[in-house]
Amino acid sequence: KSAPSGQLQLAPEGTVVTVREAADAMIAISDNTATDLLIDRLGRAAVEAEVAATGSSDVAALTPFLTTREFFLLGWGRPDGRAQWRDADVAERRQILAGLAERTIDSNPVDPAPADLDYVGIATRPATADGIGWYANGSDLCAALASLAVGPQNDVVRQILAQNPGGEFDPARWTYAGYKNGNAPGEVAGAWLLTDTAGQDWVISTQLASDTPIGPLDNAAAFELVTRSSSFL
């Protein structure tokens, strides 16, 4: 189980979750545990191969590909693994991740002070400079979403992505809106798949980041830039 956001981290051990249910939860409410279930089902190697296949500009920065649980433990666990991770090569990083397998996360602590994660630090201590996270530029995000739009079972993919459109788009201009966002301390990113009334697909991405300790960024304010700019496409 991972830390919030989401709901599946609160589900009892042994709860059966289908692939579709996990995908729905990952998109609809950014359920981190659902995301990790999908990574586990596919296998880390398959996810890393897909990163390369979509033409990522920096495959090395996404290798090994972290689960959200590993992300939290490395960046804000007690103890955290920032220094060890920062100085490690790929093989050493895989060993570090193997060492996290038995560690657990109390995703709903009664008192966050003695919890196994620094829950205050999650909101205030960015880990980007330590190499902890998922690295992509705007073109990478667009390429990944575009590959889903034309890939296998893209009709199902579109149904899933449409559960959270990430804003209000003019229905007179856009017949479809699908979306996925991501948040980390000091970072907000989002990508949209839009279809206009002529049937043309458009892919848009936005990213905001800071290396300094800041509080949670307002998604609505950040992504309003996209909904407003969509009228100019």
Regions found by a protein language model. Name each.
Residues 100-233:
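Structured C-terminal helix/loop/strand segments within mature extracytoplasmic catalytic/sensor domains
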Residues 1-12:
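Short, glycine/proline-biased beta-turn/loop segments that scaffold the active-site neighborhood
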Residues 15, 29-140, 144-145:
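Mid-domain, small-residue-enriched loop/turn segments at the edges of structured enzyme/sensor domains
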Residues 1, 46-54, 154-166:
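Short alpha-helical "patches" and their helix-cap loops
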Residues 8-10, 52-55, 219-223:
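Short, charged/polar low-complexity linear motifs in solvent-exposed/disordered segments
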